[in-house]
């Protein structure tokens, strides 16, 4: 397998330039079929200092900013923004969550296109707040991928910046869903997994998928790397524990991960400076590069800012010109547990029953939680609550906001 051997050599050479305890992994797949054409789980399998025997293509890690394209894809699909829509990159408070940019600086007014290319954090969180973290999770499942959330945590805005776990294999599978506009694929090497088409709708409608590729395809290659004709995104996890870069052309997808298998910090690594050069080298040396990114579907094109309808010229601005957090204008929504969930009663180490943590978004504080129509507690400004089920069976959970708007879910509790 010449591609496999080539990527193994790329990984070995790249590993020699990294700290002795830092490993890396690469995975390349055919976006049309799901076939894994090359998979390298470590810089050097026989290197004990790097725990080379651990296959890091299957290890769950924080993706940093690598999921941002999927947030933007949903926003494009829902018609919330266009490439030249202006969004604010300034300090913002999302009900206690205060994201900061990687370089601790803010750009002010930027276009959506610039925000994604520069991987700005605040605009990404603004968009995720608008499309909804739960809706993003559901959409990613179209591509056969379920993000790993912390125990008892509901999907939240931190997902935009890496607040969920994913493997390199699954991340490449998601990007294959971007590259293949027709049908998602499940990656497989024919040994551990079977490559197959997923019987689902396309990950995004064609115009949204093209728009994401059009933006990412114009991101400059890392310094010293020649253009490879790919759309790509990088990611750096909190605390410099993971560096990622994933890219795709019209046929193949390649992902790179760098970090320590023991999850210790690696000061100085970043997706752009550390992982992206390896991505470009591997893509070029694979001999598979060269399939142009798909052309724009009918009716899809870049629209100049001056030609945008008024509603798309600036994102999340109220009639007074003040930036508004979109959640304040939407009715309340229970994001955990979800409708129809089956909840298992857990116990702590001392044998006490653990509460069910409930989480909601949007609405206007204060809020009141009810179970089967009975209030559980006094009104609260928090968007989380705890419920101690009195037994098993079906229950209806409800939250009511200050405007009297309510949201309910039916759940089933079992031992």
Where are these regions (language model features)?
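Conserved catalytic neighborhood of penicillin-recognizing serine enzymes
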Residues: 81-136, 180, 195-218
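A penicillin-recognizing enzyme superfamily signal
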Residues: 1-18, 28-30, 39, 47-56, ...
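Active-site SXXK
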Residues: 7, 34, 55-87, 115, ...
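Mid-domain, small-residue-enriched loop/turn segments at the edges of structured enzyme/sensor domains
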Residues: 98-103, 132-173
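Soluble, non-transmembrane domains of envelope/secretory-pathway proteins that act on or interact
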Residues: 231-415
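Second-shell loop/turn segments in exported
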Residues: 1, 53-61, 99-103, 111, ...
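Short loop/turn motifs at secondary-structure junctions and domain boundaries
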Residues: 16-22, 360
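Generic short beta-strand
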Residues: 24-27, 37, 84, 366-368, ...
